[in-house]
């Protein structure tokens, strides 16, 4: 499996979510934030060659979190994100298998609480459907991504992630005017306390995609 098929998943998934987690106690919320912040460190401050090993370590922590908090959708969301990031960093034949594991974790989160972390499971799962190859190689499906993103926007209409992924989806579908509007709105989203590095990375992605959109509109 070509690593480039999954590389975008690293960036797009791990930037999701605010640190608030109403279904978790204080210790669980701190554990969640620790995983989120470590993800950002690996993603943005770690050399490429070291990322697979570091994501593998973080995946073990995320899996342990789901075992400790099996009814917390937040734990399953981040397990899915970390495993997907590991797949993107490692590449190779195992990438699709890890993407499927990520999908299963996100679906579990939706079963437990679709509204957890402002519906971020919808957004994360949509990102997978938009980026993983379609049949017969993988499970990618633009129509499913569209439906999931609409659900995410109902729960979080002004979030930087839901708007970014919606703009990205519209761009992929050739709806450049609508994509630009969504991305410009995403730039106005409020910052997320504790997720400064993630927000910085997301805004960089927004700016980069806006350049691509403008090129298509020229």
Listing of model-derived features with the role each one plays in the protein:
Residues 21-61:
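N-terminal leader/linker segments that initiate helical-solenoid repeat arrays
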Residues 48-63, 95-104, 138-146, 182-183:
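Helix-turn-helix repeat elements of alpha-solenoid scaffolds
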Residues 70, 114-116, 157:
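Short coil turns that delineate tetratricopeptide repeat
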Residues 75, 119-121, 162, 196:
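TPR alpha-solenoid repeat register
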Residues 182, 188-218:
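Terminal, low-structured helical/coil segments at or just beyond the last alpha-helical repeat
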């Amino acid at each position: 499996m070509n690593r480039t098929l999954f590389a975008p998943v690293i960036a797009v998934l791990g930037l999701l979510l605010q640190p608030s987690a109403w279904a978790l106690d204080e210790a669980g919320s701190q554990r969640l934030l620790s995983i989120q912040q470590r993800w950002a460190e690996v993603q943005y401050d770690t050399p490429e060659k070291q990322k697979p090993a570091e994501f593998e370590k973080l995946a073990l922590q995320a899996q342990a979190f789901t075992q400790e908090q099996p009814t917390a959708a937040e734990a399953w969301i981040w397990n899915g994100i970390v495993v997907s990031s590991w797949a993107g960093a490692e590449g190779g034949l195992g990438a699709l298998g890890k993407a499927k594991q990520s999908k299963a974790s996100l679906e579990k989160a939706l079963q437990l609480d679709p509204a957890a972390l402002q519906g971020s499971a919808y957004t994360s799962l949509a990102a997978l459907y938009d980026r993983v190859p379609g049949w017969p190689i993988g499970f990618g499906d633009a129509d499913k991504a569209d439906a999931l993103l609409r659900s995410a926007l109902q729960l979080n209409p002004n979030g930087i992630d839901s708007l970014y992924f919606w703009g990205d989806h519209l761009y992929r579908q050739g709806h450049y005017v609508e994509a630009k509007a969504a991305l410009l709105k995403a730039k106005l989203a409020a910052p997320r306390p504790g997720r400064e590095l993630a927000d910085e990375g997301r805004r960089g992605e927004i700016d980069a995609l806006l350049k691509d959109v403008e090129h298509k509109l020229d």
